[in-house]
């Protein structure tokens, strides 16, 4: 679209990113109330875990889910005006976003239909994630930058590892892990989307640096040709996420649902793959990693000892059970997420 207009100003990444962000945010504010009302009329309410915190059963009844629809609608409409639709990285990201959102939508729909928190068959769900991640990572491997199969390590200037074709299963692991960890973290009002905003904001900075030859050379990071459109995409995602947080902040008027969490996690995971920030992403998304580990530890230990390490998993519910209010958990986790992001960004200079 910006090429057709032929305006010099629209060739600047910073300008397009800024207005993609603003457009997506304003669209969310305008259409948010309408979408929330529509979801309520369709009775698409959040189905709560019966084994979750007891107070959630009374506080969160009747809140519509599938809020990911609001985010992605705003992102895509905004991008229509500001992005080069034929950029290969955008096409890959678009496939990831739509495919994982559809998988999450099916999961949400089945939960509502069955009126319990059991959605898609876990086997079917993981098969779907494997299929979509395999397609997208294979596309990246064959059509991506010359650095595509190389893993770069934070803190070390010249330490890197070329995985060759093994990068495909490695990338699939990153994508599926990111998708599921974001999904696990989406348990409190504003928690997952707030942390996603922190991660997205950091990736905007990394994408901008990687898209510039001068900055990439100075920081000794790969220069990714075409990454400038990722900056615009992430800007739109940032705006849509801020707009969603407007309605998802405590007390929430809408929940993200698997429609949003599975897809946003996968999208940010794919962005990390494109930007050659796979290891850095583990630091950047540190809260999500810890949340996932808490579930794994809880399940493994209980299976072998019948004892629980945490009062409840994921970790945010453990702190609720310790007496923290929902807002205390959310804001403190945001602060920790911001610290992880600062550490991750600082490694770019440490190299």
UniProtKB/Swiss-Prot annotation:
Keywords: Cell cycle, Cell division, Cell inner membrane, Cell membrane, Cell shape, Cell wall biogenesis/degradation, Magnesium, Membrane, Metal-binding, Peptidoglycan synthesis, Transferase, Transmembrane, Transmembrane helix
Catalytic activity: UDP-N-acetyl-alpha-D-muramoyl-L-alanyl-gamma-D-glutamyl-meso-2,6-diaminopimeloyl-D-alanyl-D-alanine + di-trans,octa-cis-undecaprenyl phosphate = di-trans,octa-cis-undecaprenyl diphospho-N-acetyl-alpha-D-muramoyl-L-alanyl-D-glutamyl-meso-2,6-diaminopimeloyl-D-alanyl-D-alanine + UMP
Swiss-Prot/TrEMBL cofactor(s): Mg(2+)
Top class in the EC scheme: transferase
Pfam families: Glycos_transf_4 (PF00953)
One Gene Ontology term, aspect cellular component: plasma membrane
PROSITE patterns named in the record: MRAY_1, MRAY_2
Ranges annotated as spanning the membrane: 17-37, 63-83, 85-105, 124-144, 158-178, 190-210, 230-250, 254-274, 279-299, 328-348
Pathway: Cell wall biogenesis; peptidoglycan biosynthesis
Domain of life: Bacteria
One of the GO biological process terms: cell wall organization
Bilayer topology term: Multi-pass membrane protein
Keyword Secreted: no
Location(s), subcellular: Cell inner membrane
GO molecular function, one term: UDP-N-acetylmuramoyl-L-alanyl-D-glutamyl-meso-2,6-diaminopimelyl-D-alanyl-D-alanine:undecaprenyl-phosphate transferase activity
Stored InterPro entries: Glycosyl_transferase_4, PNAcMuramoyl-5peptid_Trfase, PNAcMuramoyl-5peptid_Trfase_CS
EC number per UniProt: 2.7.8.13
Function: Catalyzes the initial step of the lipid cycle reactions in the biosynthesis of the cell wall peptidoglycan: transfers peptidoglycan precursor phospho-MurNAc-pentapeptide from UDP-MurNAc-pentapeptide onto the lipid carrier undecaprenyl phosphate, yielding undecaprenyl-pyrophosphoryl-MurNAc-pentapeptide, known as lipid I.
Stored PANTHER family: PHOSPHO-N-ACETYLMURAMOYL-PENTAPEPTIDE-TRANSFERASE, PHOSPHO-N-ACETYLMURAMOYL-PENTAPEPTIDE-TRANSFERASE HOMOLOG
Similarity comment text for this entry: Belongs to the glycosyltransferase 4 family. MraY subfamily.
HAMAP family, sorted: MraY
Protein name in UniProt: Phospho-N-acetylmuramoyl-pentapeptide-transferase
Gene source species: Borrelia turicatae (strain 91E135)
Lineage: Bacteria, Pseudomonadati, Spirochaetota, Spirochaetia, Spirochaetales
